[in-house]
């Protein structure tokens, strides 16, 4: 669809457009920023049952949209995102807007500053409509373990899935993946044109795949982590979620680059203004890692993996099987290193400076212990306990040091493959499409995370860029995504190939089976309020 034809459509239809299309419509005066913002806010309210948002920033969003309209009227726009509504995972600091990490520990916490990546979007005129739901402190792979309740996958309410189910939508719904499930649901449900997530072991790509949106994990150091509440400093990366690869590239160009407040950032490579529309695949070699044929890989996912590999080959690309021999050990290595850094990072939440503080005052030790017990859920406490165990003097060499050694071997595997002439690796993102919530919660968090992150976390340990692109719907009517992995700081090349791939696949736009009637909406609001009301 061209921008001009898109601009003639009603404002409601514009919620499903790309950033490029709706940005053109704003500049052409076919829609105002305030109209667009209001439509997004209304869509958030219509889809409250998804539980995608923790806080809706309606008042500040409308003020930002009004300022964008003034710039648009005078032709002094700030860039391609001016007037575009976006959302942010609730583990990024946002000035004067609550940042909770979906935890009782930070419930009600209002930061005095915004994260660098958030501020860069605001400086471009983007309109922040809300903070999205997640697993507590981003520890999880389903967006089911936060203090504000689980997030529901929008595709659970789309026609392809609902037409196969005779069950009540309120009981038969699927997870979004995690931990950035709220961000993925926001983009997929058309309440936001882009969303920020965080990616430590797949927390952006996993929900991106399960919710049918593009999810980019940039090279480590390309985007600033300043203001992202840390989980694992050596692996955390801000992630980008959009409905097209081109949109992800637009956002990446704005967010990338050095930040004096984050010493791990690097200078951004020179990139062209946009991705090429035509690309000669005969120059590209695509690697297929044999170790990613993992136990539990669904037939649907395997079929899509084979289909897309054939698409590359038929276009003239060389497709070659490669080996990453240490991949089978990566999930255990990741678990050890993750828990060790979690134990360190969570030590700052002591009830003294900010966040929850227990009423117990019999002693400092009692206050500290009770504060952390009340503030953290079982998942967080278990990871802290595991990390402290791995870091004991008697265990340090056996666990932490060996895991660091294995991490280097995993990174070396990738280096060897890329130095052999491979341009990108094509892999599954997840083992299967989204699980039903009722089935997902039968396993413990540790087991679920190991299953969901098996294809994604090696990339974080190697610091590489990766993007998941929606490919097709499964037989159940749910999205399946495939992952492309690139070389360090070759994010633009990765996105160029992903853009070409996306154009061959023609993934469908979400089509909701029906709007929930007023009674169902009221019922879901009641369920929501039994956890916590949006914005509370």
UniProtKB/Swiss-Prot annotation:
MF term (GO), any: glutaminyl-tRNA synthase (glutamine-hydrolyzing) activity
SUPFAM superfamilies per UniProt: Amidase signature (AS) enzymes (SSF75304)
Top-tier EC class: ligase
EC number: 6.3.5.7
Active site, renumbered: 89 (charge relay system), 179 (charge relay system), 203 (acyl-ester intermediate)
One of the record's GO cellular component terms: glutamyl-tRNA(Gln) amidotransferase complex
Catalytic activity: L-glutamyl-tRNA(Gln) + L-glutamine + ATP + H2O = L-glutaminyl-tRNA(Gln) + L-glutamate + ADP + phosphate + H(+)
Keyword Transport: no
Family according to the record: Belongs to the amidase family. GatA subfamily.
Official protein name in the record: Glutamyl-tRNA(Gln) amidotransferase subunit A, mitochondrial
Source organism (scientific name): Danio rerio
């Amino acid at each position: 669809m061209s921008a001009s034809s898109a601009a003639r459509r009603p404002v409601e239809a514009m919620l499903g457009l790309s950033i490029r299309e709706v940005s053109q419509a704003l500049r052409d005066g076919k829609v105002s920023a305030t109209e667009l913002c209001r439509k997004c806010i209304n869509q958030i309210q219509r889809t409250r049952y998804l539980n995608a948002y923790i806080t809706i920033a309606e008042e500040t969003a409308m003020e930002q949209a009004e300022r964008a309209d003034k710039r648009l009227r005078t032709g002094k726009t700030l860039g391609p995102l001016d007037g575009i509504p976006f959302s942010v995972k609730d583990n990024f600091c946002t000035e004067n807007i609550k940042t909770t990490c979906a935890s009782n520990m930070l419930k009600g916490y209002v930061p005095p500053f915004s994260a660098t990546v958030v501020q860069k979007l605001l400086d471009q005129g983007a309109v922040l409509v809300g903070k999205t739901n997640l697993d507590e402190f981003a520890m999880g792979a389903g967006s089911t373990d936060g203090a504000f309740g689980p997030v529901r996958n929008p595709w659970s309410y789309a026609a392809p899935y609902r037409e196969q189910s005779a069950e009540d939508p309120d009981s038969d719904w699927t997870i979004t993946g995690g931990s950035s499930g709220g961000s993925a649901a926001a983009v997929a449900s058309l309440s936001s044109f882009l969303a920020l997530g965080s990616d430590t072991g797949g927390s952006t790509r996993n929900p991106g795949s399960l919710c049918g949106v593009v999810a980019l994990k940039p090279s480590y150091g390309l985007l600033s982590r300043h203001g992202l509440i840390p989980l694992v400093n050596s692996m955390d990366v801000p992630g980008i979620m959009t409905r097209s690869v081109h949109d992800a590239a637009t956002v990446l160009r704005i967010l990338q680059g050095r930040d004096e407040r984050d010493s791990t950032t690097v200078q951004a490579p020179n990139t062209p203004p946009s991705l090429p529309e035509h690309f000669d695949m005969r120059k590209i070699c695509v690697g297929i890692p044999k170790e990613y044929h993992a136990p539990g890989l669904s037939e649907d996912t395997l079929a899509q993996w084979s289909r897309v590999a054939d698409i590359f080959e038929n276009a003239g690309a060389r497709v070659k099987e490669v080996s990453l021999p240490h991949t089978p050990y990566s999930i255990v290595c990741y678990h050890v290193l993750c828990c060790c850094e979690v134990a360190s990072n969570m030590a700052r939440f002591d009830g003294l400076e900010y966040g929850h503080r227990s009423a117990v005052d019999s002693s400092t030790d009692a206050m500290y212990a009770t504060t952390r017990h009340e503030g953290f859920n079982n998942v967080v406490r278990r990871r802290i306990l595991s990390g402290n165990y791995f870091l004991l003097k008697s265990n340090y060499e056996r666990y932490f040091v060996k895991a660091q050694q294995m991490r280097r071997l995993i990174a070396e595997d990738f280096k060897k493959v890329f130095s052999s002439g491979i341009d990108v690796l094509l892999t599954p993102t997840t083992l299967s499409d989204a699980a039903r919530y009722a089935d997902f919660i039968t396993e413990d968090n540790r087991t679920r995370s190991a299953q969901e992150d098996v294809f994604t976390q090696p990339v974080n340990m190697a610091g590489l860029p990766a993007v998941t692109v929606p490919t097709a719907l499964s037989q159940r009517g749910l999205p399946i995504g495939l992952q492309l992995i690139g070389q360090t700081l070759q994010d633009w090349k990765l996105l160029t190939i992903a853009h070409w791939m996306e154009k061959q696949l023609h993934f469908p736009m979400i089509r909701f089976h029906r709007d929930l009637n007023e009674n169902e909406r009221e019922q879901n609001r009641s369920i929501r309020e039994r956890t916590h009301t949006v914005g509370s």
